[in-house]
Amino acid sequence: MVKLTMEPVTRIEGHAKITVHLDDAGNVEDTRLHVMEFRGFEKFLQGRPIEEAPRIVPRICGICDVQHHLAAAKAVDACFGFEPDDVLPAAYKMREIMNWGSYMHSHGLHFYFLAAPDFIAGKDRKTRNVFQIIKDAPDVALQAIELRKNALEIVRATGGRPIHPTSSTPGGISTELDDETQKDLLQKAQRNVELAEATLELAVPIFEENIDLVNSLGNIETYHTGLVKNGVWDVYDGIVRIKDKEGNLFREFKPADYADTIAEHVKPYSWLKFPYIKDLGYPDGVYRVSPLSRLNVADKMPDAAPKAQDYFKEFQDKFGYAQQTLLYHWARLIEVLACAECAADALEGDLSGEKFPDSLERQAGDGVGIVEAPRGTLTHHYTCDENGLITKANIVVATIQNNPAMEMGIQKVAQDYIKPGVEVDDKIFNLMEMVIRAYDPCLSCATHTIDSQMRLATLEVYDSEGDLVKRI
């Protein structure tokens, strides 16, 4: 038996490894994605006042911190008796603007710095990184920095600070925008519309040049899940829509009912669980949450985003109900444009209304908040007692939900490229990494130590008893 190990997986947020298990004939027997980090944030929340949750949970991550903040805020709203539409309109809109700003920042980071090197910087490992992009196309690098800077300024103004926001309160928000700040943010959002269009003009031809790879690499057929509001793409509020493998409507449910639909499978080699649709069982019920999933389940883009709607229609006309993993990148860039347009539209409006309820009253019981994080659907579920203290917390992040699909995708790559007598090199492992990168997994939810002996690629050979006999 031979086990091939890639450690760490590069250009993702966090650390993971891939192991490929070969039988005695050299055929792929199994492929695994190992995530051995553990944080246990749910336990940290127990005993804390429920209103503190939105200020605590952003520390789970420095990239999707806004979405943890907002999902927690919506769960807290529910614990105070507020439905999403009960939140004061100006506060609701401010939360949306914060979310759109975070999307532009996160998606921009992923495409330009983590994903683009695979398509722009060549096939040599030494040049396949963001530094080569900076060297070869400094204007593109500056474009990426400007887009993310503008996005973070929007988050700073609405969230109280650019990282780990604190502004959402039960039923409202604590930040205000004066006229000068709102005008400045509007200009930044409008500029990001231009930058998002420029990014699509740059990226779409590159994707089309690599269409054979797009149509073949790590593709699997799964169910897709995402929020919609009256059938329209939405990343802050709505109902959860599930479509089956053929694109037919399978189910729609309210956020509070998520536990009736989703269950979790456990495997011993990873801290990440393997969620699935309860009625279908595992692995038949594997589903994905992602930018691609959101486009797949939506009927259209918001009226405030006509340019994104044009790209969305073109995307649907070309690919229909898309299952290709590498199309995540294309979908991600359409969302950047949509968020920039939506933010600009909102910032042109009146945001001066009341943002904090006149009275608050805690209610013992459960509160569930669901938003769409950049990587997919994010759920925060809290139970609190009559004193308003959290007794139980459950956080279901997008990367956990995509975990089964990521592993299935790298299994397919391994089976397609690793054959008896074929030398396994870093190019094959990079193809597996490309599949994982497409999902933009966020594993960096913990501050952890990296082994100083960690290598970019390791070949481990085991004997028939499973004992390690050689490491190269």
UniProtKB/Swiss-Prot annotation:
The coenzyme or cofactor needed here is: Ni(2+)
- Which positions make up the signal peptide? none
Record-linked Pfam families: NiFeSe_Hases
Q: What is its EC number?
A: 1.12.99.-
**Keyword Oxidoreductase included in the entry's annotation:** yes
Q: What's the top EC group for this one?
A: oxidoreductase
Tell me the Gene3D superfamilies matching this sequence: Cytochrome-c3 Hydrogenase, chain B
What family is this protein classified in?
Belongs to the [NiFe]/[NiFeSe] hydrogenase large subunit family.
Q: How does it assemble?
A: The F420-non-reducing hydrogenase is composed of three subunits; MvhA, MvhD and MvhG. It forms a complex with the heterodisulfide reductase (hdr).
The name this protein goes by in its record: F420-non-reducing hydrogenase subunit A
The gene name reads mvhA
